[in-house]
């Protein structure tokens, strides 16, 4: 059934829809299956996303038609479909009238992902008007709270030097805590890796107690505040709360030094909202493990990493992993800096829409995946600032002189970039950074040709066979 006469209105202007403030706008890259027309398929897509089905039903009235989602722009050559969803379509809490990401996804990314006439459809951007945006929690705290704990300025406080304890699984409580202590002697921030929780060989209660003690010892030894991000992910909201309460109680006087990590993609929006609302005074660390199943450029269904991170800010994440923008080991490219801008700025341009956040707190980019001291200056130059949390596992524990030197090398790389000093020049005066070149010679050869001569390091590579 061709539903284009009802669910398509190409006379609508995007600027008028935005000015009206009554529609959520979504941009999809969509392709119909062979034998289906583009506009007719887009209309069916909008119908399935809102008030329609595959046949006309007798219960439809004029009010129902008034809240139809409408296709307002198509560009078949670019496979672009834009749809306007009336704000009234989206579900609200009965307890407080707030909006929910679950409803947003159910409409904009629900049944339309399995339609028989659609080859693929992926959301690349969305726009929320102020009236709807204001119904989301947004972040309660962000990196400024961590800077305050660290004794830094709460604006432009710079890089938080962090790591992930490796191996990600297999360490028992005592060696895990000792690894934390070792890194904290040179760095700021440690996070649980996403699978670490309450394994039989590493009970959470035992591990957290030892980590809290390791933090106290490191702070006493260095005279500096330290930070820890504890994984409280669970299926059951009551388990999330129980874990969070135990962690904060155990850290005691250092509770403000603790972030609470939730695997937001695998555990879902309810887990993020539970943590955001139950623990509003603590940094909510949104880990996105699993997101690549839908966000990868190789996937033509789902939504992009940009959309995922934008939703995280609405939900209230204090920070979310954003990848390394092509400078680390994970999938990404330099243009991904637009994700960081959308998370941190009060108004930012996306792939299709310019979004105003109306004063909603910023969400902090968290950088991880193959980063080390040698890769960082290029990353900062691409982004234009260093107001991020870095969690470098191999970049710290893979340093030739150990994790303390690894942490210091990361900090020195940031300081070199901040001060506008070429990395090799800075390394001549800072041994940990200099030794990072020997720790990661493959990266050094690629990024800094001639580094051995500059640093006076003997070239021990075997000559290639003739």
From Swiss-Prot:
Site entry: Transition state stabilizer: 329
GO terms for biological process, alphabetical: reductive pentose-phosphate cycle
Binding site for Mg(2+): 191, 193-194
Reactions listed under catalytic activity: 2 (2R)-3-phosphoglycerate + 2 H(+) = D-ribulose 1,5-bisphosphate + CO2 + H2O; D-ribulose 1,5-bisphosphate + O2 = 2-phosphoglycolate + (2R)-3-phosphoglycerate + 2 H(+)
Pfam families in UniProt: RuBisCO_large, RuBisCO_large_N
Residues that bear N6-carboxylysine: 191
Enzyme Commission number, as recorded: 4.1.1.39
Active site residues according to the UniProt entry: 166 (proton acceptor), 287 (proton acceptor)
GO MF term set: magnesium ion binding; monooxygenase activity; ribulose-bisphosphate carboxylase activity
Keywords, ordered alphabetically: Calvin cycle, Carbon dioxide fixation, Lyase, Magnesium, Metal-binding, Monooxygenase, Oxidoreductase, Photosynthesis
Ligand binding (substrate): 111, 168, 288, 321, 368
Listed cofactors: Mg(2+)
Keyword Cytoplasm applies: no
Cofactor note: Binds 1 Mg(2+) ion per subunit.
Additional record remark: The basic functional RuBisCO is composed of a large chain homodimer in a 'head-to-tail' conformation. In contrast to form I RuBisCO, the form II RuBisCO are composed solely of large subunits.
Family: Belongs to the RuBisCO large chain family. Type II subfamily.
Function: RuBisCO catalyzes two reactions: the carboxylation of D-ribulose 1,5-bisphosphate, the primary event in carbon dioxide fixation, as well as the oxidative fragmentation of the pentose substrate. Both reactions occur simultaneously and in competition at the same active site.
Subunit structure: Homodimer.
Protein name, as recorded: Ribulose bisphosphate carboxylase
Lineage start: Bacteria, Pseudomonadati, Pseudomonadota, Alphaproteobacteria, Rhodospirillales
Gene: cbbM
């Amino acid at each position: 059934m061709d539903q284009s006469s009802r669910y398509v209105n190409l006379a609508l202007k995007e600027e008028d829809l935005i000015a009206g403030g009554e529609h959520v706008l979504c941009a999809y890259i969509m392709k119909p299956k062979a034998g289906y027309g583009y506009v007719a398929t887009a209309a069916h897509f909008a119908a399935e996303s809102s008030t329609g089905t595959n046949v006309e039903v007798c219960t439809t009235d004029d009010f129902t038609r008034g809240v139809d989602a409408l296709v307002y722009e198509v560009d078949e050559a670019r496979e672009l479909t834009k749809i306007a969803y009336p704000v009234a379509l989206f579900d609200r809490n009965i307890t407080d009238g707030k909006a929910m990401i679950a409803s947003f996804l159910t409409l904009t990314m629900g049944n339309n992902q399995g339609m028989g006439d659609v080859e693929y459809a992926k959301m690349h951007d969305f726009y929320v008007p102020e009236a709807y945006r204001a119904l989301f929690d947004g972040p309660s705290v962000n990196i400024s709270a961590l800077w305050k704990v660290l004794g830094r300025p709460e604006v432009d406080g710079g890089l938080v030097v962090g790591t992930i304890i490796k191996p990600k699984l297999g360490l028992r409580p005592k060696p895990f805590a000792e690894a934390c202590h070792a890194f904290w002697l040179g760095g700021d921030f440690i996070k649980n890796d996403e699978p670490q929780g309450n394994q039989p060989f590493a009970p959470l209660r035992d591990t957290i107690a030892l980590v809290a003690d390791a933090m106290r010892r490191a702070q006493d030894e260095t005279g500096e505040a330290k930070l820890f991000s504890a994984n409280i992910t669970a299926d059951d909201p009551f388990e999330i709360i129980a874990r969070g309460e135990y962690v904060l109680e155990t850290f005691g006087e250092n509770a403000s030094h603790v972030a609470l990590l939730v695997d937001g993609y695998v555990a879902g929006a309810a887990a993020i909202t539970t943590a955001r609302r139950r623990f509003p005074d603590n940094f909510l660390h949104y880990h996105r493990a699993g997101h690549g199943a839908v966000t990868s450029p190789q996937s033509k269904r789902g939504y992009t990493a940009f959309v995922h991170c934008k939703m995280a800010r609405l939900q209230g994440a204090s920070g979310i992993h954003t990848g390394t923008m092509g400078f680390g080991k994970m999938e990404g490219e330099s243009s991904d800096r637009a994700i960081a801008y959308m998370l941190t700025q009060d108004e930012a341009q996306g792939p299709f829409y310019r979004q105003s956040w109306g004063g909603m707190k910023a969400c902090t980019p968290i950088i991880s995946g193959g980063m080390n001291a040698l890769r960082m200056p290029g990353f900062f130059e691409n982004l234009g600032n260093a107001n991020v949390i870095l969690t470098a596992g191999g970049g710290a524990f893979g340093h030739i002189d150990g994790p303390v030197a690894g942490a210091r090398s990361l900090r020195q790389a940031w300081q070199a970039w901040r001060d506008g000093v070429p990395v090799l020049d800075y390394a001549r005066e800072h041994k940990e950074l200099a030794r990072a070149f020997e720790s990661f010679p493959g990266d050094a050869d690629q990024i800094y040709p001639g580094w051995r001569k500059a640093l006076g390091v003997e070239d021990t590579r075997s000559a290639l066979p003739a």
